[in-house]
């Protein structure tokens, strides 16, 4: 059966619309329902010199593969005119509305997955809308106590214990309870969505040298090791905590299904240096499939035709792949 994939185009002044239009230049085996302003997409397509025909979305219609040069559109109204590369806080509610719609329709099973384009967190918050990121937004909307942010690139998958919080708050956020929640989600989702029979999870320490036996911090001794031992007793394959500065080596990576980093900038710089533009952000623990690009808004490239659609293409392919594994 053909899958129906929601796509949010993201910040309207960014490269998000450009990338969605670029994706439309090829045929896809799923129906692509873009949550965006139709006039914005048509104007951006004209600016880029790319053909685009928009097909109105009707939920009662059976999903059909997307023909090249077309997108199915779920229309949303902008509050202000869009200028490429220029943020306008008046359009922040528009951005969040597209996310709300995509999340709701996935939870009701009207859609089979959502792929999200880049948003600008700063301008959304400047508009008075509390927003720390897609991952956190969808988790709250779906009433999930915890979700896991995982980025996947060829040969490496990195999941995060904490996401978009200040570094000063990270140590307090790493508790036995949270380690249990995050690792259980990771273990379960790697089995159910990725088909891994017994996933092997390698865990980074929090402190330099994984605490050096308590001489450079006690979080490993007091919190992490007891929690990991409890989880091992439940049959989960865990290695660590290991020093993060030496963990990302071939001798470890060849055996690891995923690396669990303790904070955002511990694991993602390594992954992005190896596979930037080819990696996919996947949210685990939601009641539906969500993938995303691995980059930001790149405002300076909006409307220029220079934006690289590689990550968006990977994210869409991964969403279709994962959705195809789910029973209809």
UniProtKB/Swiss-Prot annotation:
Binding site for a divalent metal cation: 164, 209, 264
Subcellular location: Cytoplasm
Domain of life, per lineage: Bacteria
Cofactor binding annotation: Binds 1 divalent metal cation per subunit. Can use ions such as Zn(2+), Mg(2+) or Co(2+).
Major subcellular site: cytoplasm
Gene Ontology biological process terms, A to Z: pyridoxal phosphate biosynthetic process; pyridoxine biosynthetic process
EC number: 1.1.1.262
Extent of the signal sequence: none
Catalytic activity field: 4-(phosphooxy)-L-threonine + NAD(+) = 3-amino-2-oxopropyl phosphate + CO2 + NADH
MF GO annotations: 4-hydroxythreonine-4-phosphate dehydrogenase activity; cobalt ion binding; magnesium ion binding; NAD binding; zinc ion binding
Cofactor(s) essential for the protein: Zn(2+); Mg(2+); Co(2+)
Pfam families, sorted: PdxA
Record's keyword annotation contains Nuclease: no
Family: Belongs to the PdxA family.
Subunit description: Homodimer.
NCBIfam families found in the cross-reference section: pdxA
Function, in words: Catalyzes the NAD(P)-dependent oxidation of 4-(phosphooxy)-L-threonine (HTP) into 2-amino-3-oxo-4-(phosphooxy)butyric acid which spontaneously decarboxylates to form 3-amino-2-oxopropyl phosphate (AHAP).
Leftover remarks: The active site is located at the dimer interface.
Entry protein name: 4-hydroxythreonine-4-phosphate dehydrogenase
Organism: Shewanella denitrificans (strain OS217 / ATCC BAA-1090 / DSM 15013)
Higher taxonomy: Bacteria, Pseudomonadati, Pseudomonadota, Gammaproteobacteria, Alteromonadales
């Amino acid at each position: 059966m053909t899958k129906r994939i929601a796509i949010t185009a993201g910040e309207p002044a960014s490269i998000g619309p450009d990338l969605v239009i670029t994706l439309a230049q090829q045929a896809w085996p799923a129906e692509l329902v873009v949550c965006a302003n139709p006039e914005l997409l048509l104007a951006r397509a004209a600016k880029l010199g790319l053909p685009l025909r928009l097909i109105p979305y009707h939920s009662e219609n059976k999903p059909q593969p997307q023909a090249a040069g077309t997108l199915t559109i779920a229309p949303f109204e902008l509050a202000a005119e869009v200028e490429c590369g220029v943020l306008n806080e008046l359009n922040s509610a528009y951005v969040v509305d597209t996310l709300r719609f995509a999340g709701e329709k996935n939870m009701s099973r009207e859609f089979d997955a959502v792929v999200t384009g880049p948003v600008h967190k700063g301008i959304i918050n400047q508009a008075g809308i509390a927003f720390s990121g897609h991952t956190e937004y969808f988790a709250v909307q779906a009433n999930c106590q915890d979700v896991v942010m995982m980025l996947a690139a060829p040969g490496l998958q990195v999941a995060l214990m904490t996401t978009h919080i200040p570094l000063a708050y990270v140590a307090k956020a790493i508790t036995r309870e949270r380690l249990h929640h995050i690792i259980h989600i990771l273990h379960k989702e790697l089995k159910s969505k990725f088909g891994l029979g017994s996933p092997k999870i390698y865990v980074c320490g929090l402190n330099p040298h994984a605490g050096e036996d308590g001489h450079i911090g006690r979080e490993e001794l007091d919190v992490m090791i007891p929690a990991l031992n409890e989880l091992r007793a439940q049959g989960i394959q865990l290695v660590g905590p290991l020093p993060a500065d030496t963990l990302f080596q071939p001798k470890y990576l060849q055996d690891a299904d995923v690396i669990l980093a303790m904070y955002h900038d511990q694991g993602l710089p390594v992954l992005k240096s190896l596979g930037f533009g080819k990696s996919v952000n996947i949210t685990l623990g939601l009641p539906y499939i969500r993938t995303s690009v691995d980059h930001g808004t790149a405002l300076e490239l909006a409307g220029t035709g220079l934006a690289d659609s590689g990550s968006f293409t990977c994210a869409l392919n991964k969403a279709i792949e994962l959705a195809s594994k789910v029973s209809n």
